[in-house]
Structure formats: structure tokens, C-alpha cells
Amino acid sequence: MNSSTNAVKRWWYIMPIVFITYSLAYLDRANFSFASAAGITEDLGITKGISSLLGALFFLGYFFFQIPGAIYAERRSVRKLIFICLILWGACASLTGMVNNIPALAAIRFILGVVEAAVMPAMLIYISNWFTKSERSRANTFLILGNPVTVLWMSVVSGYLIQAFGWREMFIIEGVPAIIWAFCWWVLVKDKPAQAKWLSEDEKAAL
């Protein structure tokens, strides 16, 4: 089996999935700044101190659950972990558009930090399962490009949604794609090459 053909096949199958998943995670994490400029602080009475607390709560959840998430992804299943996380962070993002008080918002931001904590380590583990050592640096670079690329398109989309509907609707609408994508992820993704039906036995053996 030609190794270059095998590599191209994996790149075109795996990396778009990885890119979309990480891009959606960044979208639901970063759109709070757009809402802040659109009036969420005034509507909910968020002071500068509370705004700092909300940011701290997100990263507190992110900090404490990143290692447990990585351990689960390594020992159990990246596929199952990201499937659950996609649904939960999409739900958290949409629920943000429905909150009417600061305690509820604080709880949602903390939970969002928890469920997004596993995304980066899980994606790195997933890439390591599917790419050789010589390929991983390029694959990881493509993954990280999800951040700046997402900023470009989310600025346009979020700006339009806020202008057309408002900050609440922006959160609700932007949370839905992650939930839908969770089921696409479940169908498309396998933890290891040996489980993939779209690879031949020779291609699996080459990995």
C-alpha cells in the first residue's frame, strides 16, 4: 500500500472533523465577548467585578477538568468523550441566552469550562492515534489554526445575529450546531484506525 496515498486519505477524512469540532468549541467559548458589547452586562447587571468572576469560573472548570478529561480520552474513548462534551457545551451555550440572573449565568460558565476542558487534550490524543510521529506536528498545527479561522467567521456571524435578533438569540442559535455536530461526530469518528471501515486492512497495518 502506498504510504502517501494512505496519508492523503486520512488527512482528508480526519482533519476536517477535527477542525470543525475545535472551531465549534472556540465559538461557544468566545461569543460571550460579543454579548458583552451587545448589552448582556446592562441587561443582567453585570459589574466589572462580576465579569471577572465569570471569566475566572470558566477557567476554573477548565483548569481542574482538563487532566481528568485527558485521562478518560487516553484510557477509554475520545469518541464518547467528545460526543458528550459537544452536546453539553452546545446546551450550555444555548442556555446562556435564556438566563435572567447572575447565579445561573455563573453556573453555566463554570459548566462550560468543565465540558470544554477536555477538547484540546482529546483532540491531540485523537490525532496521535491516527497519524504517525512525523505527521503529528503538521496535524496539530492545522488543529490550532481553528482558533484564528473561527475568530474570522464568528465575528461576522455573531455580529449579524446580534444586529438581527439580539444577544440572547445569538447564544441560542450558536449553541445548536454543536449539538447537531455531536451526532455527525458519533457516526464519522472511530477511536483507532483498526475500527475504521473506510480503511483497508493493508492501510490499517501501515499505521
Set out the residue ranges of the language-model regions.
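Helix-breaking motifs and short loop linkers at transmembrane-helix boundaries and internal kinks
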Residues: 45, 77, 98-104, 115, ...
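Conserved MFS/SLC helix-loop-helix module at the cytosolic interface between two early adjacent transmembrane helices
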Residues: 64-103
